[in-house]
Amino acid sequence: MKHYVGLAITSIFIITGCSNNVETQPAKTETVQSQPKNKETANTIPQNFYKEITSGKIAHIHGIGYAGNMPGISIATHSGIKVYQNGKWFETATQLHDYMGFQATKNGFFASGHPEPGANFKNPLGLMKSSDGGNNLEKLAFYGESDFHNLAVGYNTEAIYLYNERPNSKLQQGFYFSTDNGQEWKNSKLKGLSSTIHSFSAHPDQSSVVAVSAKDGVYLSTDYGNTFELFSKSVESTAVTVSNEDVIYASINKQNEQMITKKSIATNEETNIQIPSLDSKDTIMYISQNPQNSSEMVFATMKANVFLSTDGGKTWKQITKEGSLQYN
């Protein structure tokens, strides 16, 4: 579900909402142990916290990425984090929270959202951080005050960008950034933006660089979101991620076809990446590239279809089909 939120005159954010639908809870089997280097990732997962599951369905996806301290692809859902790793699926044994604004980083993840029923947390969660796959959550800011549906965090810098939908004790409505784990915040002026914004992504190593996907293309800022320039024009861009060298974004062309494009920040060279055909009523909402392996990328759609490529987009395999977990 989406709804529109106005941000003064400069832009309009589309905020991904929550649903009351409950996801199917699959049976849990074996415990995940630390994994050796594999073709998709090469990190360490917390032992005895993630359990392998043999079936399941994701109702809504609230973020996707590669946490640097866990192997596999982490997917934030309405009821906790699920991880896809080499044809297998895992989920957390506890901490089944409704994570929103999920952002994977080198040392774990950042998120907001709502606690699971009965959990000893205030609602909403505010801004949280975890360095152990979600087993422990560190309260950074706005605990019990705000639910941030739109976050972007630098993979290595941990610079935080967020859109605050409603005023809280520190922030008015608007776009803000922090470079000290959410202790201090500065407002971004967003000069140069004039159309609907779908999402934004922070550069992994340069705190001042942030990209946004918008109604008329992709915009790029190098001064903490104070000024933006049109980086790539399209009919509409629905999702974006920034790597060290490229901006990778999903767009819709004049034929109403969805596509993914990789564009060099330094040279402006564009490469169109072939993707599987999608339903015209479905939309790419999240893209993530593996920071440890640039040939691997994953994207997720509004209807909870997730596709993975390990060869730079030459071939794809579907790992969820309208939310149903696929084992391949």
Residue spans of the language-model regions?
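Hydrophobic beta-strand positions that form the internal "hydrophobic ladder"
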Residues: 73, 109, 160, 209-210, ...
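Short loop/turn segments immediately following the C-termini of beta-strands
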Residues: 78, 114-116, 163-167, 215, ...
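Repeated scaffold domains used in trafficking and secretory/extracellular systems
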Residues: 61-63, 97-104, 145-153, 195-202, ...
